[in-house]
């Protein structure tokens, strides 16, 4: 269904605010995940460690609300996701809520673990579409889920 002008106008009026919140929260989340020993890798262009950081900085005012990260070997991706209290498991993007999904269980599921590994998709890779929740609440949720 296509949005009517009546439905689309309120969404467009708050778009800049939502993108600003999503981007700032995503950067904060990427930083705390990158600093955690239980996280193997974080993929977010707002991090100086990202190979495309300089390009993203030249092109964009903000880095967006989408990031992904890998848990260290031996950590159960699904157990981690089940410990999240604020983030919602879902495959869509761009919601006002933070959405998470294990990447291996999206469109790549039918490829099998060997093919995914050859493409650089770890079984513990989690995609996060950051919403507009309070940033500190979001950071707390992702931190507490890392606890065994």
Question: Where are the language model's segments positioned?
Answer:
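Conserved small-domain helix->loop->beta segment predominantly found in fold-type I
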Residues: 27-91, 95, 111-117
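Short, small-residue-biased leader/transition segments that mark boundaries at the very start
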Residues: 2-9
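Ligand-binding pocket scaffold of soluble enzyme catalytic domains
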Residues: 8, 19, 36
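Ser/Thr-centric signal marking residues that sit
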Residues: 2, 14, 98
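Short, well-ordered beta-strand elements within core beta-sheets of diverse protein domains
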Residues: 10-17, 64-72, 127-131
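PLP-dependent enzyme catalytic core of the Aspartate aminotransferase-like
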Residues: 18, 75, 98-148
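A non-catalytic, amphipathic alpha-helix used as a structural packing/dimerization or gating element
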Residues: 17, 21-28
